[in-house]
């Protein structure tokens, strides 16, 4: 039974990842006054299948000087961690209802840094190594603000369980009382997933393709899938944290439709931002976090602690 449940979780995620690549190419195409993929299948709908067939039938190449074991294990680890992150997410029922679901997501997303670091180091290429070091520094830095924002929300929510966030937001979305945190969270998720305008690790003009420059065929596809699975996950998490979905115990289907719609809107915003903004400079990226976001999130965290105490109001308990 558990195997069936796991497959029912993994297969839709992989399908969503496949079609997200098509949606991205379509959106970028229309924003640049062209059609995007429209040859393979009706309206280009079979393009993801064609891409997958091409990538997984090509021969995976290993550079002669690379560390074979780590070179192979890094993309596998990246996708495994990206799929593991979905376990505690309520849609409307999680695969495993963890008491510390928020901490679980934070801990597992921190481990994703290792797959990037290993891939850059094992490739034995200076471009890949510089890209990996940039990505690791960026990911670790932005996790600091993500953790503090999550702490503020936990203080508001009164529980580390993600499913109680739905109960907390039955009358009002958390985006309304915590809108500065929402804006910083959304920007930090862009940086955390290495998306434009924070795609410093994949700067084509400087590093060719960043940490995955030596990867081809299947292993490259695994990295690609992990990146897009993380994008959808981060937007699903944003929906759960700030835009609590409509919840009616007698109609759980409406919760799912609502959840998917909000996630889709946020994901489209990710793609829209990619088409609209140029890449940040590396020092600007770090300045934004350490000089702007960190003091602000700490101040907001203290604000959330003090308001609860001063008004003698306790958050909803589980």
From Swiss-Prot:
This enzyme's EC code(s): 7.1.1.2
Gene Ontology MF term list: NADH dehydrogenase (ubiquinone) activity
Subcellular location: Mitochondrion inner membrane
Organism superkingdom: Eukaryota
GO cellular component, one term: mitochondrial inner membrane
Sorted UniProt keywords: Electron transport, Membrane, Mitochondrion, Mitochondrion inner membrane, NAD, Respiratory chain, Translocase, Transmembrane, Transmembrane helix, Transport, Ubiquinone
Keyword Electron transport: yes
Annotated TM spans: 3-23, 69-89, 100-120, 135-155, 171-191, 213-233, 253-273, 294-314
InterPro entries: NADH_UbQ_OxRdtase_su1/FPO, NADH_UbQ_OxRdtase_su1_CS
Function per UniProt: Core subunit of the mitochondrial membrane respiratory chain NADH dehydrogenase (Complex I) that is believed to belong to the minimal assembly required for catalysis. Complex I functions in the transfer of electrons from NADH to the respiratory chain. The immediate electron acceptor for the enzyme is believed to be ubiquinone.
Protein name per Swiss-Prot or TrEMBL: NADH-ubiquinone oxidoreductase chain 1
Species of the source: Choloepus didactylus
Gene (UniProt): MT-ND1
């Amino acid at each position: 039974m558990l195997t069936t449940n796991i497959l029912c979780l993994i297969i839709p995620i992989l399908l969503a990842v496949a079609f997200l690549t098509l949606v991205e190419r379509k959106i970028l195409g229309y924003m640049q006054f062209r059609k995007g993929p429209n040859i393979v299948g009706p309206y280009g709908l079979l393009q993801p299948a064609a891409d997958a067939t091409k990538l997984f039938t090509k021969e995976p190449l290993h550079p002669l000087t690379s560390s074979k074991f780590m070179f192979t294990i890094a993309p596998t680890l990246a996708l495994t961690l990206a799929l593991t992150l979905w376990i505690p997410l309520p849609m409307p029922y999680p695969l495993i209802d963890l008491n510390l679901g928020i901490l679980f997501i934070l801990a597992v997303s921190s481990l994703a840094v290792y797959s990037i670091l290993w891939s850059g180091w094992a490739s034995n290429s200076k471009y890949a190594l510089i890209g990996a070091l940039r990505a690791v520094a960026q990911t670790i830095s932005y996790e600091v603000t993500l953790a503090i924002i999550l702490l503020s929300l936990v203080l508001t929510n009164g529980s580390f369980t993600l499913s109680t966030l739905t109960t907390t937001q039955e009358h009002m979305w958390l985006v309304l009382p915590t809108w500065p945190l929402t804006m910083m969270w959304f920007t930090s998720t862009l940086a955390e997933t290495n998306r434009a305008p924070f795609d410093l690790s994949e700067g084509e003009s400087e590093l060719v393709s960043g940490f995955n420059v030596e990867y081809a065929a299947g292993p490259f596809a695994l990295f690609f899938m992990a990146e897009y699975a993380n994008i959808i996950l981060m937007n699903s998490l944003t929906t759960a944290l700030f835009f609590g979905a409509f919840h009616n115990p007698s109609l759980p289907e409406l919760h799912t439709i609502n959840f998917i719609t909000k996630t889709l809107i946020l994901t489209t915003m990710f793609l829209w931002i990619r088409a609209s903004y140029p890449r940040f400079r590396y020092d600007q990226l770090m300045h934004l976090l350490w000089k702007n976001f960190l003091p602000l999130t700490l101040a907001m965290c203290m604000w959330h602690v003090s308001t609860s105490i001063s008004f003698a109001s306790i958050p909803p308990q589980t």
